């Protein structure tokens, strides 16, 4: 399950954050991070209903020395999640 996964330190927009690698999540969702550039509002569904998030595009993320560029959502989440949109870029399998 999600809570048995070890948190990893990832670099997002030049900042270090602890996050879980979740192959079951489509999106990468973080809280308490300031990212550069413009954002647009988005609603995402999760456990307990929908939440409003800010969507930042073309954000550089570094996971275990591998780099990916993609969309990062910022909003209230119980834990920072690195989803499939980033994991597939670094060659992480989805099983």
Question: PLM features: residue spans?
Answer:
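Charged, flexible boundary elements
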Residues: 1-10
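Aspartic protease
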Residues: 11-94
């Amino acid at each position: 399950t999600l809570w048995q996964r070890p948190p990893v330190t990832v670099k997002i927009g030049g900042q270090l954050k602890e996050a879980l690698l979740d192959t079951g999540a489509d999106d990468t969702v973080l809280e308490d991070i300031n990212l550069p550039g413009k954002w647009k509002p988005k609603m995402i569904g999760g456990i307990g209903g929908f939440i409003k998030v800010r969507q930042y595009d073309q954000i550089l993320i570094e996971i275990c020395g591998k780099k990916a560029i993609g969309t990062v959502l910022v909003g209230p989440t119980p834990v920072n999640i690195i989803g499939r949109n980033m994991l597939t870029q670094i060659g992480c399998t989805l099983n």
